[in-house]
């Protein structure tokens, strides 16, 4: 089904005007949503547990409260804490302080779609999901445009949930560049699949396997790193700017011919079947339950996965090479320490 892009002109109702807005969490998305909304004239407070984020929110000029206090004061509550802690945060501090007619929002449908969080029937549930990390949501807003966003309504108790979702998207700058309406089911399942099969899981596995093939064949690890990882950004930037067409117009004929000949040998029908199995585990809730259960057990699996990944040869080689390439960005130890 085709969807239609919507813009600021399509946001007809200033549904957030006169509302007290509580942003729960002041991490990557939390700092961006709250600052952008404040800059567009909205009344924003922060709800966060004591710690660095609490101190940072106060430093940035926000009235900052506990999560329970902020919920009690607000008409619209946007939950931007990490997925894995939202359920306990909601049950302990948000749910007891909700009132009929409130609206609760999310930037990802995980906890609502998989029913880890159940909001009372007399409360609106909406979504505004920017398609980019928080630092880009903030930076592009300050530059006069924004990051596109998806919006959705899960529960419309007041009849105003869609207007609230769209006005929220407008308030953070997303409607300047485009909004797409979706559902909680669609956003959640597609987002998880994209992360697991392509953007994160699929991509890192492809890079690591390519690195292993080259080094096991006797090629220098440093050269293998450049061929399978360092140059990835150059190719992805071209695809981002103009699709496969621009990428193929920009590479050599040799590379383009190899693309057509060898790509299908790597991503075979069996790989497609494996991707379908990944999607099935997302759709039936297996992945969600595995993730939440691991968190509740103290994250033994996630910790083990992180330790294993940190010890990959490609990571060690890359860390050394990047020391000689300051042009690639921040130092590894400082990268993305944004509003933690």
Swiss-Prot record:
Domain of life: Bacteria
Residue positions binding Mg(2+) 1: 191, 195
Active site, renumbered: 108
Every KARI N-terminal Rossmann domain range: 3-182
GO molecular function, one term: magnesium ion binding
Entry keyword set: Amino-acid biosynthesis, Branched-chain amino acid biosynthesis, Magnesium, Metal-binding, NADP, Oxidoreductase
KARI C-terminal knotted domain segment(s): 183-328
Name assigned to this protein: Ketol-acid reductoisomerase (NADP(+))
Organism: Streptococcus thermophilus (strain ATCC BAA-491 / LMD-9)
Gene behind the chain: ilvC
